[in-house]
A protein has these predicted regions:
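Short edge beta-strand/loop segments characteristic of extracellular beta-sandwich folds
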Residues: 33-42
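Solvent-exposed loop/turn segments flanking beta-strands in beta-repeat/beta-sandwich domains
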Residues: 43-50
Length: 143
């Protein structure tokens, strides 16, 4: 059976769009981040999970909640995650669907593609509470 295409008008996830991830950019430890994904209803999603992989740590799954329909064809799922310590957290999404386990994997433009296997993850940078950029670096670019 051929599966319908995902509409190019509807992004499944976009890490650079506050509708899908808020706040945008690096966050302070203890700051809660909202993650939202938009799934086509034909997928028959029964469960969605945020996959978290702290740098050097073990993978964890956080259950996402069904958050309503966008229209007759798409539905929102969301969850909140609060990083407890500074560092990098790699993340992605795992789906339990009518067609089996599926994943949302990162594309070069930071949006998501539906995949039958795990793939590239997104990165969340978490900095120490109270960290302040030195005045001499403000507005600069560091390589």
């Amino acid at each position: 059976m051929t599966q319908p295409e995902v509409s190019p008008i509807h992004q499944l996830f976009d890490s650079r769009n506050a509708e899908y991830r808020h706040p945008f950019g690096a966050v302070e430890e203890g700051c809660t981040v909202l993650f939202r994904i938009l799934l086509p209803r034909w997928l028959g999603c029964r469960g969605a999970y945020l996959i978290r992989c702290p740098d050097g740590g073990d993978e964890a799954l956080d259950g996402m909640f069904w958050a309503g329909q966008m229209d007759d064809s798409y539905e929102w799922w969301d969850c909140r995650y609060t990083p407890e310590k500074a560092g990098l957290v790699w993340y992605g999404f795992q789906l339990e669907t009518g067609q089996g386990r599926r994943y949302l994997v990162r594309q070069p433009d930071a949006t998501a593609a539906l995949s039958a296997s795990p793939g590239p993850l997104w990165q969340l940078t978490c900095y120490e509470q109270g960290f302040r950029t030195p005045d001499w670096l403000a507005g600069g670019v560091m390589y």
